Amino acid sequence: MAQVINEMDVPSHSFVFHGTGERYFLICVVNVLLTIITLGIYLPWALMKCKRYLYANMEVNGQRFSYGITGGNVFVSCLFFVFFYFAILMTVSADMPLVGCVLTLLLLVLLIFMAAKGLRHQALMTSLNGVRFSFNCSMKGFWWVTFFLPILMAIGMGTVFFISTKMLPANSSSSVIISMVLMAIVGIVSIGIFNGTLYSLVMSFLWSNTSFGIHRFKVKLDTTYCIKYAILAFLALLPFLAVAGYIIFDQILNAYDSSVYANDDIENLQQFMEMQRKMIIAQLIYYFGIAVSTSYLTVSLRNHFMSNLSLNDGRIRFRLTLTYHGMLYRMCALVVISGITGGLAYPLLKIWMIDWQAKNTYLLGDLDDLPLINKEEQPDKGFLASISRGVMPSLPFL
């Protein structure tokens, strides 16, 4: 109750998006044409041009964002990865698997460092009212949340699953069914724990090391909450999986029967067309289930994240009021209508989605009450910093 009263006492500023679908559509058309003409070379500049348009038209508290990552930054990073890709291919073709493994491990190690430096550069190149964001973290902590923790959790999940398979009985048909149900429960809970824990720890780590000017963000997510909604999101997918699986299994049985009892080619063709129709229906049911699960998980975790994000020791807070159904039909429209129109409707629908998200995002407090001063920080220099600037061109939710 105290939090609600405090939020009612402070001014609330919703994010405002000033971009239009028509303008964004023209930008995308020009980008596609230039990318085709240049045989894909222009793609990094096209992507950054779109991102700069979105940032420049996003406003909060009367001020707009600015985004300074260039296509050249992304292009240099892409060249680095292309070089490594062909180097690994050459070692494989030259029958030097050991060298290929060493190069792959080296790329993996470099990728972790590059991701951290890329996030730092992206934050420094993003500003609001002339005040830059910044991202500073220890590489030890970054390695832990992005590499070692996921691996250890995956090993733990695999171990639990393996032990469970050995402990469950399989002496009769009924015991096999019970074992399969229990294994499914173990799998769902394990996936929920994995996804929820990683989201909670990674987002807390990233944003606790992010600053706006001289003011530091703080966020502490409830890991139990994240695990709960990760499990519920997976459970929401199960009915769709069951229906789609039943349709596919039924069609497999029908296909087997038709191969045994079919009398002529016409009957075979009719059964084949009917099978294809039902297979398409099963795929559509499955994809819709993915959309339901994804929208539920996205809205639950984003709302929780924003409600726990604060700036300058809580003087500035945030609130997100996205709804499940709002996210669901926008996601479906974005995929389905974009597919039907060959991608032509994508720019319009994306702006529609961004505008809706902006209207449901609120800043609680007044940025003008804070001393808006930039940190004395400059972008990192050197070879590793240069090739890292295009690796992470987006900080989550920034």
From Swiss-Prot:
GO cellular component: plasma membrane
Periplasmic membrane side: 46-73, 117-142, 197-228, 300-333
Keyword Transmembrane helix among record annotations: yes
Keywords associated with the record: Cell inner membrane, Cell membrane, Membrane, Transmembrane, Transmembrane helix
Positions on the Cytoplasmic side per record topology: 1-24, 95, 164-175, 250-278, 355-398
Membrane-spanning ranges: 25-45, 74-94, 96-116, 143-163, 176-196, 229-249, 279-299, 334-354
Top-level lineage group: Bacteria
Pfam families with a match to the protein in the record: DUF898
Keyword Transmembrane: yes
Localization of this protein: Cell inner membrane
Entry membrane topology: Multi-pass membrane protein
Chief localization: membrane
Protein name: Inner membrane protein YjgN
